[in-house]
């Protein structure tokens, strides 16, 4: 009857199931991938090394995109006018996250990854504050231990 091949989307019901932890994990992963790339020998002397670098690069870019997707969904679907009045920075913060995630895809500069984690953590802080949840910063037990 229907010939639907593939559908990808956040539910848009709206389901009210939002959590910036996805973006936080992905941003932390971007830094980890940048670190793994930095630990590699510059010579890339074997096909195995080239394949390994290619896999890490693909994951770095995929996780940077995941940050963008998760943040865009929360920003676009969750944040409403009262939130924006209380946190007018949310628009510029979201834009900065998008731009910084793109920089992470385009370069190997670890500072971009660190900035992405910082921005996403601020986004998460605002999100949870709108839900009246007390927020505290913790270091990840996983590398890169940020």
Predicted regions and their residues:
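Alpha-helical segments in soluble extracytoplasmic regions
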Residues: 46, 53-71
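N-terminal intrinsically disordered, cationic/polar leader segments
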Residues: 1-54, 83, 88-122, 126-146
């Amino acid at each position: 009857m229907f010939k639907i091949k593939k559908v990808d989307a956040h539910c848009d019901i709206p389901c009210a199931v939002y959590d910036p932890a996805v973006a936080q994990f992905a941003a932390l992963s971007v830094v980890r991938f940048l670190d793994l790339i930095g630990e590699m020998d510059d010579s890339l002397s074997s096909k195995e090394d080239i394949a390994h670098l290619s896999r890490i690069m693909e994951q770095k870019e995929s996780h940077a995109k995941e940050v963008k997707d998760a943040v865009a969904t929360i920003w676009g679907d969750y944040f409403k006018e009262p939130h924006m009045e209380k946190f007018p920075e949310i628009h510029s913060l979201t834009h900065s996250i998008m731009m910084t995630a793109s920089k992470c895809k385009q370069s190997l500069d670890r500072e971009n990854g660190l900035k992405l984690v910082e921005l996403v953590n601020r986004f998460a802080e605002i999100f949870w504050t709108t839900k009246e949840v007390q927020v505290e910063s913790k270091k990840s037990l996983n590398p890169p231990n940020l």
